Each structure stands twice: as C-alpha cells, then as structure tokens.
Amino acid sequence: MTTVKLTYFGHSAFHVEVDGVGIAIDPWITNPLSKTTLEDYLKNFKTDLVVITHAHEDHIGDALEIMRRTGAKFFSIHEIYVDLTQKGFQGIGANIGGPAKLDDVAPGLGIALTPATHSSYDKGVPTGAIIFKDGKALVYHAGDTGLFAEMQFIGELYAPKVALLPIGGHYTMDIEQALLATKLLRPEVVVPMHYNTFPPIRADPNEFKQKVESAGLAKVRVMEPGETVTFEF
C-alpha cells in the first residue's frame, strides 16, 4: 500500500505527500482563497520537488520562493526548465510522454507530463502531470485545460487513482466538461479545483459532486483550502 496525503490551498495549488516525499504542484500558496501563509507552508510542509504545469503566474505562484528557501528541485516542460535553470534553480526538464524516473528524488517515484489545452506564454506547451509510485498512477493534476479527447488514453493507460480537475470555466473546463473528463479518466476520486478564485471562474463544486456521483463515475471530494485528506492505494 502507498500512503498519499493531499493538501489543497485553493485555486490549483496542492501539496502531495507520497510515502513521506513532499511534492508541491502549482504552489500559489498566497492565492486569494488560501488560509495558509507562505511562512506557515514552509514551516509545516516538506517540499522535495515542485511541479509546474505551465508558465502562468497563478501556477508558478510561489514556486521560486519555495525553491529558494528549501533547495527543492522543480519538474516542468523543457522550456520552463531552460528558463529557470538559467536563473539559477535546479530542476528536471521533460516533455509529454511516458513517466520520467525520479529515483534520485525518491526510489520508485515517477512523473509523466500529459497534454493540456491551454496556453503558457512562450514557455513551451501547457501540461498536466501524473505522479507515479512503483509504476502505480496515483495523482493526476490536469493543470489548466479544456476538455480533450486524449483524456480517454490517460484513463485507458493509467486510470489515475485521484484526479484534480478544473471546473471554473472561462479559462478551463466547466462543470459539464469536467463531468465528461471524469468519465474518460476513470479515477476513483475527483477533487475539483480552479474555481471561485476570481469572478469569471465562479462555480459550485457541490453541483459537480452531485452530477459525478449520481452518474456513478467516481467519488468527489470537495476540499476546503487548508484541508488535508489521506488515501491508501
């Protein structure tokens, strides 16, 4: 069994602890919904790796300061890797495809970058990311994305245990699109994200929960900023 502790900070910011290894994903800890200060985060959460799905400010967020303060490496698409290494940060660049083996971070750890339909300034393509442990797909963070057909392949290949999906619309999937994404991805648990941070992305996560669960697609866990849930897979 693998223990996964998932903490949500609002917007699309998460900390994922996999058997004691701390991974921050799109860590905009200081977003308007967050109840956690950056100092509290640094004090209470171990960060071994920072995953950046794309170059927009609300996803790079506090990543650079976290890396400066902790010495954590980052993982990203190659173009972000080039940009940040030129600024003195240590990281691992990858591209969309099979999982990168990150045994130097933790034995059995892997991350695969997936497509995402969005934008990323001039810093390569936007991505999602799947965290693996010993070949098992544990957590899929979709990044900022609209619905795309290849989600079916992610489901067929990996069926990630937990899917973190945007539901706010306007810039990403809305509730109806995220509902279909859940069907394609086949996760056990879905956590909605990227909603209610700003007026254009207002959405009701409980409406999403009702639609997904009434269709029998997955269990939906609506997380409050600052909440931590633990899974055993």
Curated annotation (Swiss-Prot):
Keyword Hydrolase: yes
HAMAP family: UPF0173
Domain of life the protein comes from: Archaea
One matching Pfam family: Lactamase_B_3
Family note: Belongs to the UPF0173 family.
Protein name in UniProt: UPF0173 metal-dependent hydrolase Igni_1254
Keyword field: Hydrolase
UniProt feature coiled coil, ranges: none
InterPro entries, per the entry: Metallo-B-lactamas (IPR001279), RibonucZ/Hydroxyglut_hydro (IPR036866), UPF0173 (IPR022877), UPF0173_UPF0282_UlaG_hydrolase (IPR050114)
Transmembrane stretches, start-end: none
Natural source organism: Ignicoccus hospitalis (strain KIN4/I / DSM 18386 / JCM 14125)
MF GO annotations: hydrolase activity
